[in-house]
From Swiss-Prot:
UniProt: Zn(2+) binding residues: 234, 237, 253, 256
Taxonomic classification: Eukaryota, Viridiplantae, Streptophyta, Embryophyta, Tracheophyta
Location in the cell: Plastid, Chloroplast stroma
Family: Belongs to the AccD/PCCB family.
Keyword Calcium: no
HAMAP family in UniProt: AcetylCoA_CT_beta (MF_01395)
Name by which UniProt lists this protein: Acetyl-coenzyme A carboxylase carboxyl transferase subunit beta, chloroplastic
GO BP, sorted A to Z: fatty acid biosynthetic process; malonyl-CoA biosynthetic process
Its EC number(s): 2.1.3.15
A Gene Ontology term for the protein's cellular component: chloroplast stroma
Zinc finger motifs (C4-type), residue ranges: 234-256
Cofactor(s) the record lists: Zn(2+)
Gene: accD
Amino acid sequence: MEKWWFNSMLSNEELEHRCGLSKSMNSLGRAIGNTSGSEDLIINDTDKNIHSWSDSGSYSCNNVDDLFGIRDIWSFVSDDTFLVRDSNGDSYSVYFDIENQIFQIDNDSSFLSELESSFSNYLNFSYLNSGSKSDNRYYDRYMYDIKYSWNNHINSCIDSYLHSEISIESYISSSSDNYGDSYISSFICNESVSVSDNGSSSIRTSGNGSDFNIRGRSNDFDINQKYRHLWVQCENCYGLNYKKFFRSKMNICEQCGYHLKMSSSDRIELSIDPGTWDPMDEDMVSIDPIEFHSEEEPYRDRIDSYQRKTGLTEAVQTGIGQLNGIPIAIGVMDFQFMGGSMGSVVGEKITRLIEYATNGSLPIIMVCASGGARMQEGSLSLMQMAKISSASYNYQSNKKLFYVSILTSPTTGGVTASFGMLGDIIIAEPNAYIAFAGKRVIEQTLNKTVPDGSQAAEYSFHKGLFDSIVPRNPLKGVLSELFQLHGFFPLNQN
């Protein structure tokens, strides 16, 4: 696997002209000097207009050992110009123009290689010895691994460019005793970047076998909103996850491993074998039984709004399918639909699912994600707790069938007080928020402070409330083993 480095500190007048950019050079502070210490510009022909990438013979930059301060360099660096170095040491200058769909590469590196070397030495000396990056936010763009083909490299370059637009925190690491062998890689962060109260962010640096922290200010960071639709923000570490790959990673944060919310459709795709899903009662919708009206928005209008937003008819999807070849009945709640609240339609769909599984002797999986009973339906929503529990009693106690309850974040209120806690096996996701009454309700009712973490899945697990905490990655395999232990086997086995 080849590794490519994208360094941002490589644009100067030569690149400004060669890339067809017109950025003024009048804002230059102290110039890139030579070994004699001269203050004259080594590259100072600002009147020339060079539009070809291959036209660089009139420029030279020899014996460069003195660079701008980081902030000075950023006063004239082009955001669209990068240096790419492959594993063979060959350097390329890369130009991006997203709006005009231009992607150009030039491998004439007579100037770039020397500038890159000087910049690398400067970074190693400045950051690893002075221990400060307070004047720098952008000294590196992104490190990307390239596989298979040059086409993939181009795609990776574009992805890296998008990463760099919102990158503010970088990590310097070294696996050797020689700082010159260090490589620099950037990680994508969001507005907060796990910033402490004083507004500083940390950089973890490794060198000579020792670790230490460098603190840098990030108060002046203003994230680029242009590519916000490309990223999913983690609720825990505030890191950004590339949306293109986020679904394939089961909505798990790449930075901290936190399990973010999943839609019911994604959970069905995660659990059910392809081509085996058969939904039930899709056309069942609420008719506003108590004619609940709100000053902000009528109940029926709110239902219609969530139906358009999510593509669902209600806050739960029920149906039958196969899990590793084992026929099952499954119900999956969707928190995106009115907070996964349980109204009369949700209760009826779950009850019908349990009755169908009872008649067909199928195991049941219920994936819970709910804020509780739906207040817009009053006591009718509370009645669903008793109705579902009654059907579950017949399924479990009389028919001796197997019910697995999976609690995800959040699971609260009437769902927790009914079928959420009635499973023969109760599984929770890591860090899931699980409670009967929410923290705010308890504090307002009892006038007492609820300790942080007291309603997290890990705390409840240690108190014996669940059977297991299972991450999403192995969940399907765990469920398959549980079913086989209870006598439910794949259809293709004798």
